[in-house]
Amino acid sequence: MKKRKASLSLLMFTACVSPFSVLAENAIETPQQLKEVVITTTRIPELKTNAAATVTVIDQKQIAEMSKIAPDLSHLLGLVTPGMALASNTTSSRTQSLRGRSALILIDGIPQSTPLRSTDRDMRTIDVSAIDHIEIVKGSTALYGNGAIGGLINIITKKNASHTIVSGQTTLAGSTYDFFRKGKGQGYRINQQLYGNTGNLDYLVSGTFGRTGSSIDGDGEFISPRYGLGDTYTTNTLVKLGYAFSEKSRLEFMYNFYRSLQDTKLIPQGGKYMREPAIGVIGNKDPQAVEEGTRYNHNAYLKFTSRDLFRNTNFEASLYGSSLYTIFDFRKANPKSPRWEETSGQSSIKDKKWGFRTQFTSRLTLSDDVSAHVVYGYDYLLNKTAQPLVDGRYWVPFLTSYNHAPFVQVKASIWQWLNVKLGGRYDIINVDVPDYNVLRNKLKDPQVAVKGGDLKYNNMSFNVGLSYNKYRVFQPFVAFSQGFSIFDLGRTLRAAKADVLSKISTEPVKTNNYEVGAYSEVGNWLQLNGSFFYTYSKLGSDLKIENGFWVVNRTPQKVYGMELNADVKILENLKAGANISWFEGKIKTETGKWDSYMSNISIPAAKLAMYINYVPVKNTYLNLQYIHTGKRDRFAPDAKGVYNEGEGVVNRINLVNLNAGIKLKAWDLGLSVSNLLNNTYYTSTSMLMARNAEFARADGRNITFTATFKY
């Protein structure tokens, strides 16, 4: 214990101060190059170090390398994002909050999160092959409206990078667990991209098809297929077209299609919490069951941009839409825990969005020492969401929200090194709830017929930040921001016990986020950064279990913690780094004291990540990554020794990944090994859920060979 504390103290001292990319972005990149990262998710294009916020940027090179280890986006984000838990090794990302609260997931600014009824699939809405880079802004924010009480994750799709009429690349990948069971563990991926430009027109077309093998743990046992990622086939198509009317104006169209469904011969078996894992065995599914997964996720936008539309003012307008249909696992009727009027069934979520954004950015020069950018505009979003069963019954009826929001954001630069940010957004949301009957659990339960109506939400959110960048060795920032969320409204309505909408607790969650941090560069060999944060909400968003079902805990909550990072260039061809993130969440009880903890669903154990990036010779790379998550033991079992869901003990995890590659002219060859040491362990999610059926292990050693040919 003393050695562990000493090591942690040394890391905190040397790292001293924010976000960190677990894997080196490029072994020959210098800290100066890393500093010049421009982000756009804050709605004002700016350097990451000037954003007065903790920002993680995962660039295209890093995505290309990490996706060989983690082709599933939720897995990739869990490995490289401080403040986020490791992935669950399932299709669900429920336990992957951002700093203990829900994040708003965007694809090119199009919301993927479904606040009217959460899918917990927000991070599995696009394939990594279509992604150029990812911008993660941490802390509560209302820059894009409802849902970002933990932060924003904006996934930016690829675009043409060629100056020829036709260029392209073909990628083939194969993976295997075959050290254990031949014929069952193989997977493959194929990606084809074509891109180029001719005259004023540029384009990119990308298509991906992949299939994973059966998931196998470190002992060679098939992992339970419940919500599993094994035996899934994935399809993704991205089309992007751009036309430049002039050097200053451009029209761009994007369309992305994503599908991921499970097709397995395995069925779940066994599972005893903290005793034996839930496994997969070959068997026959219930004939009523259909393939689980995301049948489709369509996203599209049409965007017009104009620089200097009028004096010193840029303009951007976009129309966008999305359509999602995802199906959950089949649940056989269980007399001990009945649902859906004591019948079997399979629920799904259907979600549609249409919206537009208009934004003006004006540049002001007030004096030789003072300049400013003023961003102002208007957002509109129409969102329809329902949770039907595949047999046609509705668990949650179609809810329709209408969201209008004017906003303004000002960033002033004083003496070129003092940056002041101030902004506000006023959201007007009307949710139309139809008359509906609550789908009872038991036939003998009283039928509740809810009289529908309109739920109205008006919310004003502010943000203010200050950053100081005169000295590279110490670039501090301080920030305050607010966010709000209509947190999983459908979950509340489907369990309604009152017949009048006004009697049902549907208040939104509002958060205040305070943060202080700094970026630092020492010479051209050392980067340090870090932040400390505190978030408070009068109404909570943590989930708790009541009568076998999840409900929202509305008691006040606070989350506080820190992120620390250090990157060091040891030699020109050798780089290393480490990152630690830790935070805690408390609930204010009826006693008026903060003497209860938020569940493990929201608050993960501390996470430490370290890497070494080595370039043996030119055009090669060797990356070794180590991940450690700590223990979280905050809750006691009941008299029978049973934990509430979400309150199970989370034990430590140690994980090592290897990534190596070589470039030979037009070829890029790679070898990746996830779980290099073939560690047999349970996922954090399986431990915290504390339920037999979900007590499943993580994947064992998996080897992937990748070949990319560019032309």
Identify the residue ranges that each predicted region occupies:
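Transmembrane beta-barrel wall of Gram-negative outer-membrane proteins
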Residues: 182-213, 217-265, 298, 362, ...
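Flexible loop and strand-edge segments within Gram-negative outer membrane beta-barrel domains
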Residues: 212-216, 224, 228-234, 248-311, ...
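Gram-negative outer-membrane beta-barrel transporters
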Residues: 169, 416, 529-537, 553-639, ...
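C-terminal beta-signal and adjacent terminal beta-strands/loops
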Residues: 215, 484, 576, 618, ...
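Membrane-embedded beta-barrel scaffold of Gram-negative outer-membrane proteins
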Residues: 312-333, 467-487, 505-560, 565-569, ...
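A beta-strand signature from Gram-negative outer-membrane beta-barrel systems
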Residues: 128-167, 710
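Extracytoplasmic beta-strand/coil segments of soluble accessory domains associated
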Residues: 74-114
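Short acidic/polar hinge/loop motifs at secondary-structure boundaries
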Residues: 110-138, 192
